C-alpha cells in the first residue's frame, strides 16, 4: 500500500501533474503499473481518510488536548514509530514544521499503514503527504521538502 501512495505522490502530486479525478481511471492506471487491486483500494481509502481529517467541520480529537501537552505514545504507536522516528517528530515540532494537529494527523496516517518495517524515511514521506494536504501549510511543506531532499554538503561536525 505504501508503494502505491509513493507512486501517486511522486507521479501526480509532487510532479504537479494534473491529478486524475476519476476513481476507476486511477484504479486502472495503477493496475497497469503493476499494483494489486486490493492494495490499490487500501491506498485510495488511506488518501480519502487523510482528506476527511483535513476537512472535519466538527470538533475532533485534535481539539481536545491542550496545545502544550506532552504526547504519550501508545504501545502500538511505539512499536510502529521507533525512538528515532518519535524524536524526528519532536524535532519537526520544534522547528515549527509540524504543530500539534498536524503531528496527530501524521501519527493517525502512520498507524493506518500496513507497512511491516516502517522506517524514518517512510515517516518523512508521510509527513510530506500530510503537509501537502493541509491548507495554509505551504511554508511547512517547503521546509519539510527541503529536509527530505537536501544533500549533506561536506562533513557534519
From Swiss-Prot:
InterPro entries: Smg
Record-given protein name: Protein Smg homolog
Species, as recorded: Idiomarina loihiensis (strain ATCC BAA-735 / DSM 15497 / L2-TR)
UniProt record similarity statement: Belongs to the Smg family.
